[in-house]
């Protein structure tokens, strides 16, 4: 609990510095829910100044609300609207198109959530540490899963990413320990740094054909990950991408990959075999460091450089074939 509160404080300070914390004032209140007027006919749900901790556990947001004789359409859930509230369930109407930054951050009791297909944007940190949320259906109109949207949603076991999504932001699913499998559709072109880092329950991952860029440490310490399918499109196995994936036994690297980057498979202690395609030209420092179960390796002629300590600590390695194209070998490659 102390760790959680400390983390909340750090996040709050970060949001203040980035200008994410809204004014505590609101234009009006109806049935215990506060609103800010956006235009002559639309409003957003907003923070009430002390969070909704003592007001509601089950919330149904109306499509329209009337104030001073004017009727407004509820079109968005504003930044930090339900931050650190004791909500257990919330129903969002079809009139809403956007969910703001940190809108439901630290709602640790939230178990049920309905997001309508009308929603096209979900802001950064929107559901961070909603630790009781078990499943979520992302609407088909959402194009970006922003940074840290679902970080520390430790009970999240079910997730479907729709074909509308083109990017997954940094740490989007960081430490979602209950997540067991993930399939990234072909529509996604980029996966941010640490996107699935620390998802210790994740056993399988499929990365779609559209992905060309995967950030650093995207799957670091996914300790239960046994299989990963990387389809053609990815050009680099990035820095520490699978570091500490201690259950990973084999990986098929696609022909689109040209570089196996620094510490890409560091401490993948169950990795017994890997096939390096002819597209790869460089294997960087510590790429397979401490892969203690790796028994053989064949480096194709396409590879021109092997970094220092690339296979250091591979204590079971009994067969090594180095291709004719290698012109540069670093220090202690097989130490």
Task: Please annotate each region the language model reported.
Residues 1-8:
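Positively charged n-region of N-terminal signal peptides that target proteins for export
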Residues 40-41, 54-76, 85-98, 108-121, ...:
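Structural signature of tandem-repeat unit edges
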Residues 23-27, 32-34:
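Boundary at the C-terminal end of the N-terminal hydrophobic targeting segment
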Residues 38-50:
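Generic recognition of long tandem-repeat/solenoid scaffolds
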Residues 78-81, 100-106, 123-128, 146-152, ...:
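Consensus positions within tandem repeat domains that build extended binding/scaffold surfaces
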Residues 10-20:
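Bacterial N-terminal signal peptides
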């Amino acid at each position: 609990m102390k760790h959680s509160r400390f983390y909340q404080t750090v996040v709050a300070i970060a949001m203040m510095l980035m200008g994410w914390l809204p004014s505590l004032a609101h234009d009006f209140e109806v049935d215990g829910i506060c609103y800010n007027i956006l235009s002559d006919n639309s409003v957003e749900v907003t923070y009430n100044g002390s969070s909704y901790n003592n007001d509601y556990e089950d919330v149904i947001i109306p499509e329209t609300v009337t104030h001073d004789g004017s009727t407004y359409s509820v079109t968005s859930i504003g930044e930090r609207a339900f931050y650190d509230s004791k909500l257990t369930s919330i129903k969002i109407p079809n009139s809403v198109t956007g969910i703001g930054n940190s809108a439901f951050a630290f709602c640790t009791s939230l178990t049920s959530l309905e997001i309508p297909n009308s929603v096209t944007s979900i802001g950064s940190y929107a559901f961070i540490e909603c630790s009781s949320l078990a499943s979520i259906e992302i609407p088909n109109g959402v194009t970006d899963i922003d940074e840290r949207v679902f970080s520390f949603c430790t009970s999240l076991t079910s997730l479907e990413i729709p074909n509308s999504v083109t990017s997954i932001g940094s740490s989007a699913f960081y430490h979602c320990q209950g997540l067991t499998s993930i399939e990234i559709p072909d529509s996604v072109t980029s996966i941010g740094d640490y996107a699935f880092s620390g998802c210790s329950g994740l056993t399988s991952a499929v990365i779609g054909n559209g992905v060309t860029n995967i950030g650093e440490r995207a799957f670091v310490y996914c300790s239960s990950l046994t299989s990963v399918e990387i389809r053609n499109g990815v050009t680099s196995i990035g820095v520490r991408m699978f570091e500490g994936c201690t259950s990973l036994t084999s990986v098929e690297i696609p022909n689109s990959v040209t570089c196996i980057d620094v510490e890409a498979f560091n401490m993948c202690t169950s990795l017994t075999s890997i096939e390096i395609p002819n597209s790869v030209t460089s294997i960087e420092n510590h790429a397979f460091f401490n892969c203690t179960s790796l028994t053989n390796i064949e480096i194709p002629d396409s590879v021109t450089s092997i970094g220092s300590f690339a296979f250091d600590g591979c204590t079971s390695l009994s067969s090594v074939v180095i291709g004719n194209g290698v012109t540069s070998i670093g220090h202690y490659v097989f130490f």
